[in-house]
């Protein structure tokens, strides 16, 4: 049912954003991380690319049904058949559990090396206040940029919103200039400058894209 898919997305994306917000403010406000909050935020963040892929597929399905003359609101709540040959691939029901699990985990997302490297840089930024110390004027800015870069990079794993990775360019520019505004040690300058350049450079490769997304293919760059 389309409404169920949209409800799933509405539950995942906003709740994921709230969890990430708590992770951003915790070290700044209370000076430490919460293990349970980190686990919850990681679980929600990993679901965001899958939720976005499902929402896009649902919207495209509703558009196709509307163009076919079906009332989209009725289709939204009751469902409908889609375009196609109507043939059933019986071999799909005979696959091994491992193959099915792999298809479930890789459906709608790919793992380009550039985004995986961006995730690594983001985690490095989030942990950098541990050696920069929270007394450093730039520590909070580095931590926030790391959390935002992690969110952007994980979300961009969804092929249909791969262009979202270019938000890391903005984060990279902020990192490069943050120590100049707030001040900091030489180590802080080097950390921000290196991480900023890495984030900007890693946005260039798009990486492989799996599947076809209809009209959205033109936006996958």
PLM region descriptions:
Residues 103-115, 136-137, 155-164, 187:
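Short, recurring structural edge motifs at helix starts
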Residues 114, 118-134, 148-149, 153-156, ...:
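Extracellular/lumenal glycan-associated surfaces
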Residues 141-148, 190-200, 217-221:
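Short amphipathic alpha-helical linker/capping segments at the junctions of internal repeats
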Residues 2, 184-188:
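Membrane-helix interfacial "entry" motifs
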Residues 1-123, 127-128, 202-221:
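Secretory/periplasmic and organellar redox-cofactor proteins
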Residues 1-6, 155-167, 208-209:
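Membrane-helix interface "capping/anchor" motifs
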Residues 5-10, 163-171, 192, 219:
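Cytoplasmic-side transmembrane-helix entry/capping segments in multi-pass membrane proteins
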Residues 30-40, 139-140, 189-194:
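Non-cytosolic membrane-interface motifs at loop->transmembrane helix junctions
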């Amino acid at each position: 049912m389309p409404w169920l898919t949209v409800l799933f997305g509405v539950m995942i994306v906003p709740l994921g954003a709230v969890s990430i917000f708590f992770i951003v403010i915790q070290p700044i406000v209370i000076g430490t991380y919460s293990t349970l909050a980190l686990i919850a935020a990681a679980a929600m963040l990993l679901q965001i690319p899958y939720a976005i892929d499902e929402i896009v597929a649902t919207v495209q399905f509703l558009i196709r049904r509307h163009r076919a003359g079906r009332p989209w609101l009725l289709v939204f709540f009751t469902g409908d058949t889609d375009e196609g040959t109507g043939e059933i691939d019986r071999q799909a029901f005979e696959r091994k559990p491992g193959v099915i699990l792999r298809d479930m985990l890789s459906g709608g997302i790919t793992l380009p090396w550039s985004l995986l490297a961006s995730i690594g840089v983001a985690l490095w930024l989030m942990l950098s206040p541990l050696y920069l110390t929270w007394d450093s004027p730039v520590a909070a800015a580095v931590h926030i940029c790391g959390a935002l870069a992690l969110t952007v990079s994980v979300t961009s794993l969804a092929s249909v919103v791969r262009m979202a990775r270019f938000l890391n360019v903005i984060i990279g520019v902020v990192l490069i200039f943050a120590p100049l505004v707030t001040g900091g040690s030489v180590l802080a300058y080097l950390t921000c400058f290196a991480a900023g350049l890495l984030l900007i450079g890693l946005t260039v490769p798009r990486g492989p894209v799996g599947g076809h997304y209809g009209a959205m293919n033109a936006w996958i760059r």
